[in-house]
Amino acid sequence: MKFIDEATITVSSGKGGRGCVSFRRERFVPRGGPDGGDGGSGGSLLFRVNPSKRTLYAFRSKKQFAAPNGAPGEGRQKTGKSGDDLVIEVPPGTLIFDADTGAIIRDMVSPEEDFVFLTGGRGGKGNKHFATSTHQTPRFAQPGEPAQTATVRLELKLLADVGLIGLPNAGKSTLLSVISAARPAIGAYPFTTLSPNLGMVTLAGAEPFAVADIPGLIEGAHTGAGLGIRFLKHIERTRLLVHLIDASAIDPADPVAPFRIINAELAMFSPALAERPQVVVLNKMDLTGAEALAQQFINAAGIKKCFLISAATRSGVEELKKHLFELLCSHDT
């Protein structure tokens, strides 16, 4: 399924049904009074968080959503049937914006959260309501209230505890695949990952936590180079970043270059994101020469704690998982 994280749709509630003009007509009651029933209410339009959804793919082709109208009232004081509410399901982390003004309407984050966006129109009153002592046969009724219509822009920002960042081919997708049940595309070439992936990491006796793998960034991403910064929004909600570096590709002439490039791009996108706590991880330690290059990076960067792992062989991965869990727990307190 293609990853879709933005969509613009037009939504409407249902209009209220018209009130009925009717008079009681029964044998031996030649001049029965008005008995027109009320119209039914139109259906409301709601947005609901569905935790099983991970993309806005459902809105790729369908752009119009309308709740049913209320039915008109009937004789014998029968109220018309109300229109059913229309529920639009969205993934957790969906932002709803006014398409015209850009103002944020709602941030849908809580599981099973319901947001009544457009209320259905009330049904019109039947003519039974308008009889008076001086006007006992009203031949009019109220129309139902009109529907409400709006155009909204939906934007998805994944809800993850940890975000994986790094240059292309650093091994982010491989790491995600070994620490979770996620199965992202993996290849030995840059830009294998073309959209974010989300995985749940589990530890024995502990609450699982979510990790997002973001497509690799390159220098100049904030100006649109490579895949640009379109997907960086998906780690804005994270509490922690894992900065993954390919140890085997470190340049001895400038060992800190990969680290510096990514952090510069983060700062260009969002100063707040650049200040997010980071765990620095040197990957591909199983490759020839990686150990010496990793030491050069550590010396040049002056980082006190750095994890040395091989996602391919899973060396050091369990220790990393435990450390991430401990950090997340400490940030909760």
Swiss-Prot record:
Keyword Magnesium among record annotations: yes
Basic and acidic residues bias locations: 75-84
EC number: 3.6.5.-
Annotated GTP binding sites: 166-173, 191-195, 213-216, 283-286, 310-312
Superkingdom, taxonomy of origin: Bacteria
CDD domains the UniProt entry points to: Obg
Cross-referenced Pfam families: GTP1_OBG, MMR_HSR1
Cofactors named for this entry: Mg(2+)
Assembly and binders: Monomer.
Entry protein name: GTPase Obg
Organism: Desulfosudis oleivorans (strain DSM 6200 / JCM 39069 / Hxd3)
The encoding gene: obg
